[in-house]
Amino acid sequence: MPKIKTHRGAAKRFKKTGTGKFRTKHAFLSHILEKKSAKRKRRLRKKFVLSAGDVRRIRAMIPY
């Protein structure tokens, strides 16, 4: 049976942590930033851990 291919788009967006969780960048920080507060933009700069429901899908896209 052939190996499962890694979804290259997902591989670029999600990184697996040592404990098996996935971290990714927040949305809403690429444009239209003038109306967003400095506090909101600062918080969006940090990475965040995906929820359990999303992890199931990402694990299928990034098997290795």
From Swiss-Prot:
Secretion signal, residue range per the UniProt entry: none
One function term, GO molecular function aspect: structural constituent of ribosome
Disulfides per UniProt: none
Record key words, sorted: Ribonucleoprotein, Ribosomal protein
GO biological process: translation
Family under the similarity heading: Belongs to the bacterial ribosomal protein bL35 family.
NCBIfam families in UniProt: rpmI_bact
Name of the featured protein: Large ribosomal subunit protein bL35
Source organism: Desulforudis audaxviator (strain MP104C)
Gene encoding the protein: rpmI
